[in-house]
Amino acid sequence: MDVMQAAGLIPATPPAPVLVAYSGGMDSAVLLHALAATDGYREAGLRAVHVHHGLHADADAWALHCQQQCADLGIALQVVRVQVARDSGSGLEAAARAARHAAFAATLAAGEWLALAHHRDDQAETFLLRALRASGPDGLAAMRPQRPFGPGTLWRPLLGHARADLAAYAQAHAVRWIDDPSNTDPQHERNFLRTQVLPALQQRWPLAADALARSAQLCGDASTLLHDDDVNLLPTVCNSAGALELQPLRSHSPARRARLLRAWVAAAHAPPLPAQGVHALEREIATTQPDRQTCFAWQQTEIRRWRQQLYLLSARATWPAQWQAEWNGDSTLLLPDGAQLQLRGTPGLRFEQPLQVRARQGGERIVLPGRTHSHQLKHLLQQSDLPPWERTRLPLLWAGKTLLAAGDQIVSAKLDQWLRAHAARLQWRSAAPAN
């Protein structure tokens, strides 16, 4: 039994079909070799993927090396070429990682497990990086052994092994690999920790990497317990529409409120809420002014306050001020921000004459059912339960110079009579919010 299986880190029975992320480096080469040496993985459909970033002059040669090694092992390999955004603002290393993970998610089959070759030394480096960024328990948990990923599961079976264990395996089994010179460039934060900091720590404390990895595991345990509490508490501070209610939120401590805010955002599959967002929203929670309206925006997402509630929204395209369209009601009208306008009734129903649909300009007036005089649309909308950011996106229906409706929220006497006569109604579907 080899050193990998002896430690029980590669189960003899595969948990699912496995896709190995194979860079060609020593770590992934050892992982691929160890899995290929176990018949159960082959029978379950073991395969590999190599991401060609195109960032190094030898990238083509590395892809060819991976193809040759997989051919020798009898393992199917898929080479995926990606374009790395050099102007992403997050740095080339982060951009390459994002492109790589997107390629993994696109390649992974439903129910398949993506095996990554991260080991204990990698875990220690990640823990230090997160600590230097002032992370809490969630961040200090570093890399989890497994978690949901794309259509399958991300799996790190080697987290309990030291880099030295992998090197010993590679030597014992004559595993061939390639060396990426960028992995030793101290300009990269992780490489600096790997080549400068950890060796110094291990010279003074030989088990430093083990201790740091163990601390990450303990933080992971604490994070799991806190997450369970978040899941149980979140329904007590959310309303049926998914908005956060400020009053019950105020009953919790600032630390718990911060966790609930992040859990609320995560539950909507929105980008993680940054620290400055937590601080900004904490000020909102502390302010009890009933008519206060504010917005915090990040990564095409925004949180807005209205009527003692917080709403999580996806950023949407603005309406061109002069936008207009003709619509006879026989098909769905797609609006500039992704919303839809429909005439619901008997099949084939349409207006006798096409109506004009326009964006709000201000100053509009409308005659309501049962009234003989007109009202300012602005005042009617202020009295409604429609949030202010939705009011500005209402499509206005006109017949010449007569305002007939503002979405499906306010309908004129004339259009209301026509809809009743045809057993019909307007339906305005706002673009889906994040929550």
Curated annotation (Swiss-Prot):
<comment type="function">
    <text>Ligates lysine onto the cytidine present at position 34 of the AUA codon-specific tRNA(Ile) that contains the anticodon CAU, in an ATP-dependent manner. Cytidine is converted to lysidine, thus changing the amino acid specificity of the tRNA from methionine to isoleucine.</text>
</comment>
<keyword id="KW-0819">tRNA processing</keyword>
<keyword id="KW-0963">Cytoplasm</keyword>
<dbReference type="GO" id="GO:0005737">
    <property type="term" value="C:cytoplasm"/>
</dbReference>
<feature type="binding site">
    <location>
        <begin position="23"/>
        <end position="28"/>
    </location>
    <ligand>
        <name>ATP</name>
    </ligand>
</feature>
<dbReference type="Pfam" id="PF09179">
    <property type="entry name" value="TilS"/>
</dbReference>
<dbReference type="InterPro" id="IPR011063">
    <property type="entry name" value="TilS/TtcA_N"/>
</dbReference>
<dbReference type="GO" id="GO:0032267">
    <property type="term" value="F:tRNA(Ile)-lysidine synthase activity"/>
</dbReference>
<keyword id="KW-0547">Nucleotide-binding</keyword>
<dbReference type="InterPro" id="IPR012094">
    <property type="entry name" value="tRNA_Ile_lys_synt"/>
</dbReference>
<protein>
    <recommendedName>
        <fullName>tRNA(Ile)-lysidine synthase</fullName>
        <ecNumber>6.3.4.19</ecNumber>
    </recommendedName>
</protein>
<comment type="similarity">
    <text>Belongs to the tRNA(Ile)-lysidine synthase family.</text>
</comment>
<dbReference type="Pfam" id="PF11734">
    <property type="entry name" value="TilS_C"/>
</dbReference>
<dbReference type="Pfam" id="PF01171">
    <property type="entry name" value="ATP_bind_3"/>
</dbReference>
<dbReference type="InterPro" id="IPR014729">
    <property type="entry name" value="Rossmann-like_a/b/a_fold"/>
</dbReference>
<dbReference type="InterPro" id="IPR012796">
    <property type="entry name" value="Lysidine-tRNA-synth_C"/>
</dbReference>
<dbReference type="InterPro" id="IPR012795">
    <property type="entry name" value="tRNA_Ile_lys_synt_N"/>
</dbReference>
<keyword id="KW-0067">ATP-binding</keyword>
<dbReference type="GO" id="GO:0005524">
    <property type="term" value="F:ATP binding"/>
</dbReference>
<dbReference type="GO" id="GO:0006400">
    <property type="term" value="P:tRNA modification"/>
</dbReference>
<dbReference type="InterPro" id="IPR015262">
    <property type="entry name" value="tRNA_Ile_lys_synt_subst-bd"/>
</dbReference>
<keyword id="KW-0436">Ligase</keyword>
